[in-house]
């Protein structure tokens, strides 16, 4: 570790002593790629505030790289899977998801479930390697952590918290069909006005759209499983030595930090232990590298367009690249395109290719006019933060849903990556750049995002510290977690009331019958 980081850690430790033991110890169960980027923002802030943060990473981790200088501590757990094998597996999953036809409901989500199970099997293997490593678990026990911070999309963090007997906090963007949020967190999503995730619907639904949304909800609630829950339940029961389920352990989460906010999400009810922290990674733009700044300034009053399909897409076909390049060549703006491939034949003089872009800094530049994006939540939040209208070209996962949200809010135009023509892309760019309503709507979302009493990052850190200070947040946990499914839906109460009504009706009917019989008998006696 460099002298710089050593000095920083010494200062942090000194601040802990001076603050009378207010510093805590945080154990982190991370997830790869953009999930890690978000959670690392929280971890860096926790370290800045004097807390000791330990990241539990498996030896094949891609982004949580313990070899990079960092104030974070890393505990590495060996696993039989190599980094190359893991990265190839993830790349194949992304490619398969991108290739699934989205216009066929059942096959689409059956493939999604299959891929989620494949990913879940890898995570379960990593989890087994951790909890079966007696030396590592003993070290974690002796470290006396105050809280576990985990991404709910990768199970195991809650199991570690249960084994270590400490509270845990979740960070989560979403799960397909809100499955984890509903079954593990008890969240409420009325289907009459809350569209199911990945449905690409908006909150203002027609009757037939509400029918469609109800079908989605029933499918995700009773058929679709994010993970192979049966195997996870058996695994957790075996490790803990008692019958339990994955969702039963997930329900013990003290706080859910959802990476969303009302500038992005449609309004819906929230539980007391749920906090929105969307855009926590966003920050003011920094100066661009000299050569890039010169290129941006050369655009004059026309400005620039920023184009990025994210870090997980690097296999664009030559045909698609040429379709895109020819459209970009026809606009008056200069274009900065993140592209890792052979230079397209139709590339215009106004377009520069880069293997990496300082995306946030470009979106915050005063000359940026539009953002062509795949619809990743991180990129969309940076565009919202800086008030930049978007052309959405979603590829997989939550991206189509994200772009549907931005389109509903009037800040984006959507295109289909596989079928769009050069003319389609050109017209979409002209629309979001020349029609002022898109810029106005983007700025409105930006204003909403900035007008919060507490910044998202500060809110996330506050609640983690709150859980450490109070050894949990049980006072925010709804009693619904302690009810059976029929108690939750008051079916036992409804059954009891129906039985009471039926009993009263039966008694009244019997009484009336007896009175009728008595009267009839008396009349017959008088005749005799």
Curated annotation (Swiss-Prot):
- Glycan attachment residues as annotated in the record: 315
Q: Which GO terms describe its cellular component?
A: endoplasmic reticulum membrane
Top-level division of the source organism's lineage: Eukaryota
Q: What does UniProt give as the signal peptide span?
A: 1-21
EC top class, as a word: transferase
A single GO molecular function term of this UniProt record: glucuronosyltransferase activity
Q: Kindly give the SUPFAM superfamilies that the UniProt entry links to this protein.
A: UDP-Glycosyltransferase/glycogen phosphorylase (SSF53756)
Under the heading InterPro entries, the entry gives: UDP-glycosyltransferase (IPR050271), UDP_glucos_trans (IPR002213), UDP_glycos_trans_CS (IPR035595)
EC number(s) per entry: 2.4.1.17
Q: What protein family does this chain belong to?
A: Belongs to the UDP-glycosyltransferase family.
**Identification of the protein by name:** UDP-glucuronosyltransferase 2B19
Organism, as annotated:
Macaca fascicularis
What gene, per UniProt, encodes this protein?
Answer: UGT2B19
């Amino acid at each position: 570790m460099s002298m710089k980081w050593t000095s920083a850690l010494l200062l942090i430790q000194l601040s802990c002593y001076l603050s009378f033991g207010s510093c805590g110890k945080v154990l982190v169960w991370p997830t790869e790629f953009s999930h890690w980027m978000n959670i690392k923002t929280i971890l860096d802030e926790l370290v800045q505030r004097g807390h000791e943060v330990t990241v539990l990473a498996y030896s094949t981790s891609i982004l949580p790289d313990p070899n990079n200088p960092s104030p974070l501590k890393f505990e590495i757990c060996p696993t039989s899977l190599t980094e190359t094998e893991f990265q190839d597996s993830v790349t194949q999953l992304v490619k398969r998801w991108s290739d699934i036809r989205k216009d066929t409901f059942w096959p689409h989500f059956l493939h999604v479930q299959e891929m989620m199970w494949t990913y879940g099997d890898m995570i379960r293997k990593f989890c087994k390697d951790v909890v079966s490593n007696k030396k590592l678990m003993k070290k974690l026990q002796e470290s006396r952590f105050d809280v576990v911070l985990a991404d709910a999309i990768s199970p195991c963090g809650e199991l570690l918290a249960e084994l270590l007997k400490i509270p845990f906090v979740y960070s989560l963007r979403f799960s397909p069909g809100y499955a984890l949020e509903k079954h593990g967190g008890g969240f409420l999503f009325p289907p009459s006005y809350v569209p199911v995730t990945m449905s690409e619907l908006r909150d203002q639904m027609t009757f037939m759209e509400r029918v469609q949304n109800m079908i989605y909800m029933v499918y995700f609630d009773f058929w679709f499983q994010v993970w192979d829950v049966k195997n996870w339940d058996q695994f957790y029961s075996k490790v803990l030595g008692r019958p339990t389920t994955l969702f039963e352990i997930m329900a013990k989460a003290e706080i859910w930090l959802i990476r969303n906010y009302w500038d992005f999400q449609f309004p819906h009810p929230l539980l007391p232990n749920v906090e929105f922290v969307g855009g926590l990674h966003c920050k003011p733009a920094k100066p661009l590298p000299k050569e890039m700044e010169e290129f941006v300034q050369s655009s004059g009053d026309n400005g620039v367009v920023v184009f990025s399909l994210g870090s997980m897409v690097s296999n664009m076909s030559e045909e698609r690249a040429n379709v895109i390049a020819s459209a970009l060549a026809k606009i008056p703006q200069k274009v900065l395109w993140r592209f890792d491939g052979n230079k397209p034949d139709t590339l215009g003089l106004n377009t520069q290719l880069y293997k990496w872009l300082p995306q946030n800094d470009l979106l915050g530049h005063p000359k940026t006019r539009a953002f062509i994006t795949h619809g990743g939540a991180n990129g969309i939040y940076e565009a919202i933060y800086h008030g930049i209208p978007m052309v959405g070209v979603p590829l997989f996962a939550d991206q189509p849903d994200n772009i549907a949200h931005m389109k509903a809010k009037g800040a984006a135009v959507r295109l289909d990556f596989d079928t769009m023509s050069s003319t389609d892309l050109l017209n979409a760019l002209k629309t979001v750049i020349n029609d002022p309503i898109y810029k106005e709507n983007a700025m409105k979302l930006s204003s909403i995002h900035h007008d919060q009493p507490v910044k998202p990052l500060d809110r996330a850190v506050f609640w983690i510290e709150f859980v450490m200070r109070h050894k949990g947040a049980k006072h925010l946990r709804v009693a619904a977690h302690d009810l059976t499914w029929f108690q939750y839906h008051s079916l036992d109460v409804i059954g009891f009331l129906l039985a009471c009504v039926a009993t009263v009706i039966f008694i009244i009917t019997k009484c009336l019958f007896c009175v009728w019989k008595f009267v009839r008998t008396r009349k017959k006696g008088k005749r005799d």
